[in-house]
Amino acid sequence: MTYMFQGAEAFNADISNWNVSKVTAMNGCFQNNYKFNIDIGNWDVSSVKSMASVFELYEAGVWGGGVFNQDLDSWNVSNVTNMYFMFQGASMFNPVSYTHLRAHETMV
């Protein structure tokens, strides 16, 4: 799923029921996608090893924007080794309560 919807600025289709259980890399999947705000909290991401820049928002030298703010508390990220810039610039997302995500210091 690496860079699958990168730059698809208006993409907001309901992909909540996708089977992603065999996905190992999600790098930049929703990078620079400003409209995406679908609940994907039920995704089985337990096989994913890299989530770098999944929700990163950066364009024309400016960080920020986007509306993604869904509950990802049920995500099993125990196999993830890279969350670098996962939510960088995703100003609406509030990961404060997601202690299992916060363990990765370079996430934001």
Where are these regions (language model features)?
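Negatively charged
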Residues: 2-102
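A short, hydrophobic C-terminal helix/tail in secreted or cell-surface proteins
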Residues: 103-108
